[in-house]
């Protein structure tokens, strides 16, 4: 599909407003359930097709998605911002409907599993994550599933690869050095496609990289990551880990 053609690039400005109030109920000491309301409004302007043949007429339409969402999670992480042990299993489902004010009817199923394993060597951590974002219905352009950015497969410009379905896996070794210094090494793969049945090993997007960590206060790191992806590189400066 056009999502995967490197030449099909469009430059544009993008404005977004979103709100997602949610009520959470603790089920037990490791689990939560939640129900919420999700509102997203997006508009694009100043389009430049950069000599590509892509039809961007859909992007010229503002998008409004309004719906209900439901969350379930199971969380045994020892520290949410920078875990060294435990796991997180989370399912977030969204149901957007025109009778609630949405322009179209569609659903989003966002699934995530993360695990953190302490390593004997100097409190190092092996972390890994599997994530999928599956959609169904008349999905507007701004609600397509994306890969890239500082957490969803570093190295790719977020939004460059987007489609109705997304699947990714990533693993990271977090190494403590002397004092408050540390390093990380990671690799990951991801895919986007129109339908789940269209996922193909021919369309795998690889990512790998190295990062430096500085502990500004206990269990809170500044991170600098250099990521290498397919025909792209990325540099990221953030607080706390990618996942």
Regions found by a protein language model. Name each.
Residues 1-64, 69, 162-163, 221-222, ...:
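Gram-negative/organellar outer-membrane beta-barrel architecture
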Residues 58, 68-73, 77-177, 183:
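C-terminal outer-membrane beta-barrel translocator/porin domains of Gram-negative envelope proteins
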Residues 1-5, 45-53, 83-85, 101-107, ...:
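Outer-membrane beta-barrel translocator domains and adjoining extracellular loop/strand segments
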Residues 1-5, 46-56, 87-95, 145-154, ...:
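Flexible, solvent-exposed coil segments and beta strand-coil junctions
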Residues 1-3, 35-41, 87-95, 111, ...:
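Transmembrane beta-barrel strands of outer-membrane/channel proteins
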Residues 26-33, 119-124, 179-181, 220:
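Secondary-structure transition into beta-strands, especially the periplasmic turns and strand N-termini
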Residues 19-25, 37, 70-74, 111-115, ...:
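Residues on the lipid-exposed face of transmembrane beta-strands in outer-membrane beta-barrel proteins
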Residues 14-16, 65, 106-108, 123, ...:
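Membrane-spanning beta-strands of outer-membrane beta-barrel proteins
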């Amino acid at each position: 599909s056009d999502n995967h053609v490197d030449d099909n690039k469009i430059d544009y400005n993008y404005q977004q407003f979103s709100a997602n109030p949610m009520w959470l109920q603790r089920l037990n000491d490791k689990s939560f359930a939640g129900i919420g309301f999700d509102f997203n409004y997006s508009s694009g302007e100043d389009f430049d097709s950069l000599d590509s043949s892509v039809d961007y007429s859909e992007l010229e339409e503002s998008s409004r998605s309004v719906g209900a969402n439901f969350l379930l999670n199971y969380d045994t992480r020892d520290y949410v911002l920078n875990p060294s042990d435990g796991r997180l299993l989370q399912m977030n489902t969204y149901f957007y409907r025109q009778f609630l004010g949405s322009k179209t009817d569609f659903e989003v199923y966002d699934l995530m599993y993360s695990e953190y394993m302490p390593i004997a060597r100097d409190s190092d951590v092996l972390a890994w994550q599997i994530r999928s974002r599956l959609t169904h219905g008349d999905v507007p352009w701004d609600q397509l599933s994306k890969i890239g950015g500082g957490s969803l497969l570093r190295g790719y410009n977020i939004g460059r690869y987007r489609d109705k379905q997304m699947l990714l896996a990533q693993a990271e070794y977090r190494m403590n050095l002397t004092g408050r210094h540390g390093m990380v090494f990671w690799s990951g793969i991801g895919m986007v496609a129109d339908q789940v049945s269209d996922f193909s090993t021919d369309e795998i997007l690889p990512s790998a990289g190295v990062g430096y960590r500085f502990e500004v206060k206990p269990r809170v790191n500044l991170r600098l990551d250099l990521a290498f992806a397919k025909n792209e590189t990325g540099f990221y400066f953030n607080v706390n880990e990618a996942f």
